[in-house]
Amino acid sequence: MCSGVLLTLILGGCAPTTSVISVTAATTESKAAQDAETFEQQYAKYVSLPLDEISEDDLTPLLTGDLLAESTKEIADTRERGTQVIGKYTYSRFAVTDQGIEASGQAYMVAQACLDVTGSRIHDSSGIDITPDRDPLVSMQLKAVTVDDGSWRISDAVRNDEVKACD
């Protein structure tokens, strides 16, 4: 009878048992869970950055592509206008809703989260609060992709009330 130990399977020439198959399936599920956890950790770091001190150096390990470029430009524009965004965002209900491989071979994940913006304010160059009326909770849809070194970066973060992440 064949042993379930991998070394025995290789040396003994036995066919893999179902326990090897289930280990492979469990490994795949475990990898998917680890990737989802990494995505949430990246998002948690992103939303917890102090808005009045944020820099491109803070964003580069977390974001990629258009989202990184747009965020960097927004920081520069805000500083150029003399406005200051203070405080921090928080989030809840983060959930990965899709995972896969794009046609290019790049791995991706899609998630939704409820972004709480009540901890942030916008001040003009005189220090006057100019925060517009806004929804305190925002349903967000997010996408993360793997970059060249195999790590995950957030590539998209858009408001999407259809995902109902805050309900």
Regions found by a protein language model. Give the residues of each.
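Core segments of small alpha/beta cavity-forming domains
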Residues: T24-Y89
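Sec-dependent N-terminal signal peptides
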Residues: M1-L6
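Structured, amphipathic secondary-structure segments that form assembly/contact surfaces
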Residues: P61-A165
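C-terminal motif of bacterial Sec signal peptides marking the signal peptidase cleavage site
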Residues: L9-G13
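Bacterial signal peptide processing site
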Residues: C14-T18
